[in-house]
Amino acid sequence: MKKFLHENGLSLVLIVITVIALAGQILVGWYDFNGELKDYGRPAITLLTYLTTGHCIESVFENWESEFLQMGLYVLLTVKLFQKGSSESKSLSEPEEVDREPSPTRRGAPWPVKRGGWVLKLYENSLSIAFFLLFGLSFYLHAIGGLKEYNTENALKGKQEILSLWQFMGTSAFWFQSLQNWQSEFLSVLSIVVLSIFLRQKGSPESKPVDAPNDETGE
């Protein structure tokens, strides 16, 4: 168990933090939504019922969507683009391990590398593909949740307007929800790319060595 915790500590801690934050968001969202229902003279709903509401679904996947888009684009952009002095960039002049051709004879090579062909080609791009698939799923669920929330709010206000999914995705409300998260995610990536040029964190693989010159590029 001690070995398992040592080898997987980073992912385990991040899972715990994510679950706690998500649970907190759902709980306070439930109270917030019931407060809104109370304002309109409607009865409160249970936590389980709240999980199926647009208020809950939209708030969760609106944020997940931007995270997966950010990571997918970042993975692709760092293949060809550079930033002098940043620990997040590949070297400007020296070849990188990640650019060499995969060898099926390398010890412990994953089976797609040994298989070759289209399987290898897919595996070579599997990280960005996975992020964009997760982005697409989250984008769709955000739209579903946002539509339910939009129509629910109209019903509470006594409005007769009921939109379809495609109609809702064409509204400024939907794109405001998306873009306000997208810009913040890209700003956070820009921050670590630029700040890692000048600032250090001893012991972190996201930082250059403390004594590295500012113009040294890569980790």
Task: Tell me the role of every PLM-derived stretch.
Residues 102-133, 137-140, 144-153:
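Domain-level detector of nuclease and nuclease-like folds
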Residues 1-19, 117-133:
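Alpha-helical transmembrane segments and their helix-start/interface "positive-inside/aromatic belt" motifs
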Residues 2, 45, 86-118, 203-219:
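Extramembrane terminal tails and long inter-domain/linker segments of multi-pass membrane proteins
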Residues 36-55, 156-166:
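Perimembrane loop-to-helix junctions flanking transmembrane segments
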